[in-house]
A protein has these predicted regions:
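Short, conserved catalytic or adaptor-binding loops enriched in Gly and charged residues
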Residues: 203, 413-415
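Generic domain-boundary/flexible-linker signal
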Residues: 106, 130, 223, 284, ...
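Generic N-terminal targeting/processing segments that precede catalytic cores or assembly contacts
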Residues: 2-182, 188-189, 198-225, 229-231
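Phosphate/pyrophosphate-binding loops at sites that engage ATP/ADP/AMP, CoA/4′-phosphopantetheine
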Residues: 158-165, 404-412
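Short, low-complexity, polybasic intrinsically disordered segments
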Residues: 223-234, 433-440
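A structural signal for small-residue-enriched, beta-sheet-centric alpha/beta enzyme cores
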Residues: 2, 12, 20, 24-26, ...
């Protein structure tokens, strides 16, 4: 079955305009690689490529241009993330493909070199420098699923090409010294999972292999707006994707990002992670904990419970939350996910907290009628009743401890000592209002 990438939309609740899905950078890279191979071998310039996804479905991906220079064919695809607000949306993903003559000595020796795919990162594609990520240090930042997609779709294209009468392959091939592809960065060697008929395109007895370089012309610039610098990915973007499809505002994608950040922190032997909801709360926490490495600071957005569970499962012994008042209230309410669409602010809870501390009913009524959490905090500050803030902080920590305990019980190997959890609660000007939990 072939899906049209231009018409794939998510269902729209309550009559809101549907959000259009798109395709991942991994799908874009696979499409570009197939288009370049087709142009190199057959001279056909594809307008679109049907990319086989991990699910087994096919997705039609438009191809912008194909070209040939010397022995290297190029094709580029514009990454279309649909309505997902990703910085790579609209980025050019280019694949350059060359037919590489295999070393005759290896071919004729006891261990003949089989046809293979040599895949590397070109301009604007990052290189992994830290452990804890799906790709190993020194490898191109091309994740396992995109690697598999490139390998499988190239193999399928070779099978398609094998049905044609192809001539002059020797004239299309080059030696390593004839091309600058993969000259500066580490390369991956991927198996060519093609049947014998498909491999005949690469000549008798594995005469040729395929050299594929993936580029993103603006990748280094765009990567500065991603988590790559923090994750230790240098020089550009990552080629990502687990399904090949990008779903707008995907929870799964953000959870994978949090998990990756934790994995990097764990690989540095960090025992503490500082969970912030965004850049400002992270900056405030960094000022308080200059002794912690940059990997220890993880922005979790609204994924409160997920982040705590992941931290426990990965064996961290201390969690520090850095939050503003509104998020602290939602944490105290026990919301696992604190985004406004899923977790409406309950200011009656704020009023009930004030009552439990013996405050006058007039203050409690004002809090119950506040417009926002920020407004509620202004009322508290005006009254000088900061014990309410401290109570909210303590309750938020209790909820975090509850989530951590549940995760510990669910883990195969529970931690020998309870995880220590601490919370720093800031006002909207960056002043520390309250601390709660262990070490507070």
């Amino acid at each position: 079955m072939v899906c049209n990438s231009k018409k794939s939309e998510t269902e729209s609740p309550r009559g809101r305009p549907a959000l259009r899905t798109g395709f991942s950078s991994g799908t874009a890279a696979a499409a570009a690689a197939v288009a370049a191979l087709r142009y190199l071998i057959s001279g056909t310039s594809a307008r679109a490529i049907a990319v086989k996804l991990p699910s087994g479905l096919y997705l039609g991906v438009p191809v912008e241009t194909c070209s040939l220079r010397d022995c290297v064919a190029s094709a580029f695809v514009i990454k279309d993330g649909g309505d997902d607000p990703d910085v790579t949306n609209g980025a050019q993903i280019i694949a350059k493909v060359a037919l590489l003559r295999n070393d005759p000595e290896k071919m004729c020796g006891k261990n003949p070199q089989p046809p293979q795919i040599i895949l590397c990162a070109g301009k604007g594609i990052g290189t992994v420098t830290k452990p804890g990520l799906p790709a190993l240090p020194g490898e191109p930042a091309i994740n396992p699923t995109p690697r598999q997609m490139i390998s499988e779709n190239i193999s399928l294209e070779l099978l398609r090409l094998a049905t044609f009468e192809l001539e002059g392959l020797q004239d299309k091939a080059c030696d390593v010294s004839d091309t600058s592809l993969c000259a500066e960065k580490a390369a991956l060697r991927l198996p060519l999972n093609a049947n014998a008929k498909a491999k005949t395109v690469l000549g008798p007895a594995g005469t040729f292999s395929l050299l594929i370089e993936i580029e993103a012309p603006r990748g280094e610039e765009l990567a500065k707006r991603t988590l790559n610098p923090r994750l230790g990915i240098t020089g550009g973007l990552s080629i990502l994707g687990t399904t090949g499809i990008v779903r707008p505002f995907s929870h799964e994608a953000y959870e994978q990002t949090i998990h990756a950040a934790f994995s990097v922190a764990s690989s540095t032997c960090a025992k503490t992670v500082v969970l912030s909801t965004g850049g400002k709360s992270e900056k405030l926490a960094r000022q308080r904990f200059p002794e912690l490495g940059p990997e220890a600071f993880v922005q979790i957005a609204d994924f409160f419970s997920f982040a705590v569970r992941e931290a426990v499962m990965l064996g961290f012994s201390r969690i520090i939350h850095s939050v503003f008042f509104g998020k602290a209230v939602k944490m105290a309410l026990g919301y696992p996910y604190t985004h406004a669409h899923a977790a409406p602010m309950d200011l009656q809870f704020l009023a009930a907290t004030a009552r439990s501390l013996g405050h006058k009913e007039q203050l409690c009524q004002r809090l119950s009628l506040a417009n926002t959490a920020r407004h509620g905090l202004d009322i508290i500050a005006e009254d000088g009743s900061f014990d309410i803030v401290e109570k909210i902080a303590r309750t938020a920590v209790e909820q975090s401890v509850r989530v951590a305990d549940e995760a510990s019980r669910a883990a195969v190997a529970s931690q020998s000592a309870p995880i220590r959890i601490r919370l720093l609660l800031f006002d909207y000007d960056g002043n520390l209002l309250a601390e709660a939990g262990k070490e507070a």
